[in-house]
Amino acid sequence: MEDSDDSEAKLREEIEAELDKISISSLENDEVENDSVSDTQSDSSDTDLLELPESVLHYINVIKNKSKTAEELILQDVEDTDIFSDYKKGCNHGTVTDSHMHLRTGSLPESKANAEQLMKILSVIEKEEFMRSLAPSARCVSVREIITPDTPMDEYILPDEADLSFGYFEVEERCRKSFEAWQDKQQELEEKDKETLEAQNEREKRTFQEEDEKRQCWMRQFEVEKKHLEDLQKQDQDKMNDELHKEEKIWKEKYRQHEEHIRNLHLKMEEERTRLSELQEKEKARLFKLRYDAAVKIQATYRASVTYRKYSPIIKEQMEKKRRRAQELKEKEAKIRQKEEEKRRRLEEEQRVEEEKKKKMLEERRRREREYEEKKSILRQEREEQRSKEVIRLREHAHSPLIITCALKKGDCHGKQQAIAHVPKGKGTIAKESVDSNSKKQEDACLAQQLNKRENTHVQQLAMKKSTGIKLKPNQAILVELKMNEKNESLPKLKINENLSKNQCSEQPSDQEFNAENVDQKNELENSNLKESVNEQYPWQGLESDTQTEEHVEHVREEKVGQETEKLFGFNQEVSAEDSKQAQGVMEETREGLAEEIEIKEMTQQGGPSDENNSSPISMQKSLPSLTPDNPEPVERSVTLEEDQETDLKSERIEEIPEEGVLSCDAAVINADASVHTEGEADLQDSASGKLAPSEEAGSHSANNLLATEEVEDSPKSEIQEALEKGQQTKAEADGVLTCSVSQLTVLSSVEERRLAWVKTFKPWAEIFEQNQHKKIVKKRRLVKCPPNTMPPLDPSAILQYGPWKSLKQVPVITFQGLPGCSLSTLAECSNLQILSLRRCGLTSLQGLSHCTRLKYIDAQENHIEAISCENLENLSVVLLNNNLLTSIHGFDGCTNLQSLELSHNKITRISGLESLKYLQELTVDHNQLISTKGLCEAPTIVYLDCSHNHLTGIDGIGNCGLLQIIKLQGNYLREPPSLRNHVLLRELHLDDNSISSVEGLSSCWLPLLQYLSISQNSLATIVPLFHLVSLEKLDVSNNCLSDLTNVMCWFNACYSLRELCLTGNPVLQEINWRDSILKTLPALRVLNGDMLNSYANDRIEEHYHQDLRCLLALCQYQLQEFNLLPEKYITQKRDILTLHAVDRLSQYYKDLMKLSHECRRAHEQGDVNTTERSAAETNKNHPDFSNTDSALQNKTLHAQTNSCEADSPATSPNPLDTVFRPSTSHCEELRGRNQEKLMAHKSEQSRISSRSNSRASFIEMKMADSPMSNHHNAERSSPTKAAMVIQAQWRSYIAHRQINCSAEMHPTTTEPLQDPLINNQTTSNEERRKTNMDIQEQREKAALHIQAVWKGFILRKKLATARKAIKDEESGEEYEEIDLEDFEFDEDALEKDWPALDSTGFPSQTLPLSNQLPWPKNSRTLRHDETSPTIPVRPAQAWLCNEKENVMSSEYTQLSSRSESGILSWTPDSKTSRKNLLQSEKEEKISEEWGFKDISTAQQMLKRAKKMKSKKLRKKLEPSVRLALFKKAKNKVSVTKSSKKTQLRRDNYFEAHISSQDEEEEAVSKATAAKEKLERSQEYTYQWLHTQVGFPEATSSRNLKCNHFLPELDPDVLNGGRVQLVARLVSREDTDLDLFSMTSASALSVNKDKKSQTHRYSTGSSSKLWFPSELI
């Protein structure tokens, strides 16, 4: 088919090409010739329109059969000769043949376009013919015209065929018309059909569109309805879900509350059980104590009676001595008062004389002033006259040259010379007059100055007289004022004209004499004031030290005279050299004379036999002028006024320190050079002004005491030697307690060796710090993978709604918690931001803070931060990034002021990026993955370092960290301690949970401030000696391999500062005597293995060390105290900082910590221990170290200090006795005179002293405190003195009571004890009667004691047996009642009321009955048994064994059931049980409603537990019958009555075993009902367990029914097909279910929990965290 189409197309193209080539010339000729013929034919063409020619028909047929023609043409051969010949013939003849037309028509395409083309051709032909017919004349012209190629071939007709052409045209016209008509009809028909079809199509389209629209509307309605239904369904589902969630939350909350309540109940039960066991132990101890006290009381009474009989004459003698001494003291006091009165009168007389002198001087001064005024007026008048005369002369001499002529020039010159000569003469006379007047004025001024000086001295003397009670500060202030006045008065003298130098030289001797007199008066006044003040403060030393005080004051006065003269005449050096030389000569002469006189006097005073230590008091006074306690005034030196003022200020500051807080390290202050250091002088002056006065009271320190008192000198030497020997013996005993002791010299040498080694090898901190500050920071580009920022930015409105800010630029604080996730791009606008806290906000990076330049505090804990960008935040101080995902330390470049950085719980492997952190002090990187710490060398300022719980095998980079104070390295893989050769400030070192096997590295380190050392849970088998750690207080070496006790003692030897020691988990604890050995080695130990020790020595640490180490130790203690006080000053809640003020305080704390660390490091490097002596004294002011009050220990300490003081000479070492508080001489005499009293008092300390004796002792102490002899001792009396005073007071009260008892023995008929022994103080006058009654009284006492011992022992044994039985039967606690702990506590007084009061006339005060115990005659019907074999009562067993049902009853019912005996007996068992059941059911229902229990058994169990845990109220002391009834807990309640007669009648039934038949019936019924109820309860439990196993999981969980079930429960998960747990959990289900455990099982559970809670090696968590069971979390 395709081939035919191609051939047809080719043929058509060839035909048209040939037709176009045909020549038209022949056609034109034929047209011209046949014009006429064509006209005729055109005329006849109209008629022939209806006839169609064959060609037209042929065309029509061809059109109709075009398909056939096309097929024929396709099949026709292209080379057919006939067709082409016919075609040529037709062309030659000029006619168009049918074949041509056939070809023309056949060449048209089959489409409609070919038909239209044919119609156009025919129409063109028709128009041509029609035009020819209309214009025949134009034919010729048209023929000659050039035929265009566009002209169709059919228009040209040849002349030979004219006829044929006419017919052809007509037929063709007719055919055309008919064809047009037919075509029009066809077109109309087609249009009609088309219109109908279009209309039908429109209708169909419209219907289809309508249907489509309906369909779309239906779909929309369907969608709307569907959506509506879905919304309704969703709402219903949401409501249902919300309700379900709410119900689930409510049930979960109820479930949690129920679990928590049950857990609390279980914990309370456990606590009650432990408390029960503790109370039982306490009860045992109390009973043992009661027996011990009774035995002690009996022994004390017996010994007291024996002692009284033996020592009664000695006591009388001592009482007489005491009276005589009291009388002597009164006489001394009277003498002292008399002397004081005389001194007062003398001072008043002197004051009166001075006042008279003052009045005379005032009158003289006024007279001189009047004379001065008169002379002044006269001089003024004379001066005015001279001035007027001089003016007149000058005027005359000025006019004289004008009158003289020029001829008389010589005479004129001579006249001028004379005039000039007259003028100087007048000036000279005026100068002389002025000089005379000035000299007179100077004389008057000198007189006035002298008057002023005298007035000032008188005023100052009066002021000093008024302030005689003031010690050092007012006297120094007066001296300074005197010096200021004298200097102010000497200043005008320097401004006097040089012309008056001679007059001054003439007046100088008189001024010197006057000044010397003033100085003498001033010194005398000061010395008198000092003497009076000393006498007022120490009246007991008034008569003893008057002579020495006067001598020493005279010595100081003479020295002051020379110094004052030097100061008063020092200004003469400025006037002239001669005057200065004369003044120096005078000063030297006066000094030499005074020195000679002082030496002569002192040699004469000390010429007698004296000790070697007193041979050089002058040298001691020169080197240590303030050691003499009788001279409170400082020795004046030639220093400036500013230095004096500084000294005064320092002395004032030191005077504020309380007198109890003086340290023993003050001896080191005294050892310093007093002539150089002003601080030392101030301290010594203060100590000399009254603080060291008690040091002279001992009386046994003559070797070191510079000024011994008269009483000590007069006392016999034998007593002194005995006291010294006793002190040496006590010291030897105290020193002999320690084994393997290390001498002080050894400790000193080893400590000093380590310190010197450190001094030689340490790197100066200043150099390290300077290098760190000036190092160049090289910025390294670190490729940190930042997570894509896909989170939304922080909402600005959320930031602004929490404050009064209007824009983000004003926001200073941002705090959020728990945000879903955000980015920090919003914070770029917060330029004023200072605090940023975003916890649990889902942050992945810390970026966008570059514009927050004022940011100080960042808290981004508990996020997912992986990248940090906080560059160039210079104000940033604290950054908290705990619990994130960091893998390295980065992003802090330019944060130069960052001080605290916390990065715990991250994934950091190495420490780096700390180059720019020049002030970093706290770095926390615990719980990371660290394997190296080399980056720490970039931050040498670190103070606190926490690298715990990492993977470290060694610590590097801390060599330059010279300020490190706390290092935490627990939970790593360390094999040895880190190198600490440059860390003198280290205070805490934590090395727990490592693999350390040796600590040899610590032996060579100098760590003077190390307080806490923890090496627990390691592999230590040996430890180095630790005595070189002078400040070590806490040591933990638990869970190691220490096994040798002797080595342990050697390691801990000489560790005098150690207070807490933990050795748990070591094999050494298996030794028998390890505890005693440790306590002997460490007498100051207070806590051993977590247990507080009651008996520990409270000695000072400095006492155990050598004197050369005490200053160093004081420095260390001071620095430690400063470090401990600094956090308390600034920080209260360090990690809850959300205010700007708190952040500023934290920053200031870090700054002060850095400053203090610098100072302490500098002090250690320079070896300057004197810089903190005054501060140490101030520190001890706030923290005084009170010693133990035990008298024996205090005596040991006192004697030891005395002997140590005797060993040192005062010239080579400081006297430690200056800081030891010693008793006064009067007390020393009493102690020496009462040796026997002390022995007896020591024996009687163990006995009990009655309340009267205690009140008497306190009264005596108050009286002694108010007396003038002890005014200065109230604040500074040491504990030994106080202990001695208490012992003496108690001994005196004991003697007074014995005297009272002796007087009471005179009247044995009196049965009531004396209420006031002081009133009834009578002497024994009838000894014979006392001796006869003594035997009878002793027999009575023995009988009474025997009876009491038998009865109390029986009761105690009975109670203990019952308690043991109850404890053994605890496992079956459902059947027995709990043990009432208060039943063990019986009132001794109430029991003793049953016994008559013994006749205590022959007993001392210890056996007297109490004041509230009235004597009661013994009733013969009380006991119904033999004295040798007492019968055991049967009924007391009811006190512990009772009906089980009564245990469930509440306390209210117990109170309601207390009624009379008759009412109880009238009750029947049925009514009793029904009443109990009624109350029980009401109580159970109430509890079930309140707690929401579904099962009544839970309420029953709760009631039982509440009954067991209920604390009983304290019972009042009732009558004996009621007391005994409550004690027995019998079912028959005894009525509470106040009648004494009824109680007397009931005493008959105390010890009778009586059981009535009614009681037996009640017991049988109660047992039957109890068994029945028990069976029903067990059946109910079984039924409940079986029906709740396959129920709802919430209802059947182990926690919910923990208190209800009694059988082992099944897990609901197991019933639902879950897995069965084959491996037990950390805490099994039975451990938490405490209802099934008895007391023994509970104790086993606690042991198991303790074992499980022990920390394991290489644990990931901190050892300080608490462990909880999985069910309880």
From Swiss-Prot:
Compositionally biased intervals (Polar residues): 603-629, 1168-1226, 1308-1325
Residue ranges annotated for the IQ domain, each copy included: 291-320, 1280-1309, 1340-1369
Cited SMART domains: IQ, LRR_SD22, LRR_TYP
Domain of life assignment: Eukaryota
Positions of LRR repeats: 34-59, 216-239, 491-516, 641-665, 830-852, 853-873, 874-894, 895-919, 921-939, 940-961, 962-983, 984-1005, 1007-1029, 1030-1054, 1067-1090, 1378-1405
GO biological process terms, semicolon-separated: apoptotic process; ectopic germ cell programmed cell death; gene expression; single fertilization
Basic and acidic residues: compositionally biased ranges: 326-374, 549-567, 588-602, 647-656
UniProt-annotated stretches for the region Disordered: 22-48, 189-208, 324-374, 544-658, 679-702, 1163-1230, 1308-1330
PANTHER family: LEUCINE-RICH REPEAT AND IQ DOMAIN-CONTAINING PROTEIN 1, LEUCINE-RICH REPEAT AND IQ DOMAIN-CONTAINING PROTEIN 1-RELATED
Record's protein name: Leucine-rich repeat- and IQ domain-containing protein 1
Species: Mus musculus
Gene it is expressed from: Lrriq1
